[in-house]
Amino acid sequence: MAKSELKRKKHQSGNEEVKEKRQKPLKNDKKIAEELPQDEDDYEQEEENEDADQNTSVESESEELDNENEDERVQKSVNLNASSTSDIEKFSDLQLSENIQKAIKEMGFETMTEIQKRSIPPLLAGRDVLGAAKTGSGKTLAFLIPTIEMLYALKFKPRNGTGVIIISPTRELALQIFGVAKELLKYHHQTFGIVIGGANRRAEADKLVKGVNLLVATPGRLLDHLQNTKGFVFRNLRSLVIDEADRILEIGFEDEMRQIMKILPSENRQTLLFSATQTTKVEDLARISLKPGPLYVNVDSGKPTSTVEGLEQGYVVVDSDKRFLLLFSFLKRNLKKKVIVFMSSCASVKYMAELLNYIDLPVLDLHGKQKQQRRTNTFFEFCNAEKGILLCTNVAARGLDIPAVDWIVQYDPPDDPRDYIHRVGRTARGTKGTGKSLMFLAPSELGFLRYLKTAKVSLNEFEFPANKVANVQSQLEKLVSKNYYLQQSAKDGYRSYLQAYASYSLKSIFDINKLDLAKVAKSFGFAHPPNVNITIGASGRTDKKERRAGYNKKNHVDVYSKQRSSAISQDKERGWSR
């Protein structure tokens, strides 16, 4: 009995000693920062020198330290940010660490946007936030700055595992968030990583096991790692960010998000949920992810428009058979500008890119059926270009911050006003951004303008004189009829366009029965409508499993694409008529 008591006292004494050592460094953050390893190799070496028991002990101690330091940080942040957000205009007004202030300054940011002014202070104070803001409002910095500051304040190291998880709906948006996080973490020692569908899963798992403090992820791949990657430490999670929540749910990740919420620890976790629209599903997700009584930040309520200032918006009424001619003429006149053209289906984008590149009008294309590496390369190539044309589906419509876009062209109109708002949000971004948008509408589709007006979006009608539109219809039809592979691509594009049109939710406006198929066929280069098989009324969206697999018909498609590319190249060498 006495021996047991002696052992217990000795254990208590040891704990007090550990606690004293643990508390002491809190008085000198700068000294601790200087003692931290300088790169990931140091982290890895440190982990290799610890056995499993020591690592468990360190992680357990780290949890206690985090909780203690977090209470101190939250109280400090509440006191420092108690003043009205109207007093805070610049990032330098925030009580941030020197390292992150330096990174923000080097990135060229000085004045905060409305969403940043209203959300960063309460986030620094530890509040859960449900944010609503139009695209291009600066949400990325609004959630990255507080979460990185938290990691720094809690002295996260690789052995502590993941402290921040940011969930994004698309791979491109995840890559973009990752890029911004990398710049903000330039002067920090915390580790960061990204896990997305289409990337090398084993390489991701290896990095997670080594320790990733800030993780950017898409829902499907994140759930995979949470369930199957042994050694992925996420018990110390302190901040969860759900970006573009409405989009995540729209594209079919509702079940995955519910499973993720069940797996992730909720104790001591701050949650940030950003959504451009507040739907019933978003409210349900907020209910299971946020603590009761979150701070609701809506910077759009009461504003006269749903799109950003500095954006000049217009539409043009054009018959289906003249759509390509107008697009071709418009792009030829804007070769020195940066232009994004939205289309409704992957096959339409693919065909139009092949066609335009063939007739020496260089374009890039981005859609969901491309391999991930190509999508990534295309995205960054267009981001870094001073001028150029990008043809894409809605994969690029949400959240992506592409610099200096001059024109957004909606060649195929969107399914609803929300999609319109997100598409045009690729231009006129930031506090002083400017840009223009143009939407093509058939005479039968003009009723869509009423829906836009209800959503606080007003457009002016643009007119293009007929003598300014190049009439290349006969050359187009001749080219498509002579080139077999281009003809097959045109058929695929035509079929997928009709399938997508049939899936539109606003049937009173976008009624496939009102389409003049002969005119639609001409816009794809056919003199007469080709015979294609479509199911009217079926969804034009790909199945979720097919989408996650990256379009699993890859063997057939890859061979077909190579043959077509080779044939088109041979045609050009022969100097076929254009």
Curated annotation (Swiss-Prot):
A Gene Ontology BP annotation from the UniProt entry: maturation of LSU-rRNA from tricistronic rRNA transcript (SSU-rRNA, 5.8S rRNA, LSU-rRNA)
Ranges of residues in domain Helicase ATP-binding: 120-296
Motif Q motif, chain ranges: 89-117
Keyword Metal-binding belongs to the record: no
UniProt keyword list: ATP-binding, Helicase, Hydrolase, Nucleotide-binding, Nucleus, Phosphoprotein, Ribosome biogenesis, RNA-binding, rRNA processing
Motif (DEAD box): 243-246
Catalysed transformations (reactions): ATP + H2O = ADP + phosphate + H(+)
Principal place of residence: nucleus
EC number, UniProt record: 3.6.4.13
Gene Ontology terms, MF aspect: ATP binding; ATP hydrolysis activity; RNA binding; RNA helicase activity
Biased composition regions of type Acidic residues, renumbered to the chain: 36-53, 60-71
Matching SUPFAM superfamilies: P-loop containing nucleoside triphosphate hydrolases
Catalytic EC class: hydrolase
Domain of life: Eukaryota
Comp. bias intervals (Basic residues): 1-12
Any single Pfam family the record assigns to this protein: Helicase_C
Domain Helicase C-terminal residues, every copy: 310-480
Cell location: Nucleus, Nucleolus
UniProt: ATP binding residues: A133, K134, T135, G136, S137, G138, K139, T140
Bias type Basic and acidic residues, positions: 543-561
CDD domains in alphabetical order: DEADc_DDX18, SF2_C_DEAD
Entry text on domains: The Q motif is unique to and characteristic of the DEAD box family of RNA helicases and controls ATP binding and hydrolysis.
Subunit annotation: Associates in the nucleolus with the 60S and pre-60S ribosomal subunits.
Similarity field: Belongs to the DEAD box helicase family. DDX18/HAS1 subfamily.
Protein name: ATP-dependent RNA helicase has1
Gene source species: Schizosaccharomyces pombe (strain 972 / ATCC 24843) (Fission yeast)
Organism placement in taxonomy: Eukaryota, Fungi, Dikarya, Ascomycota, Taphrinomycotina
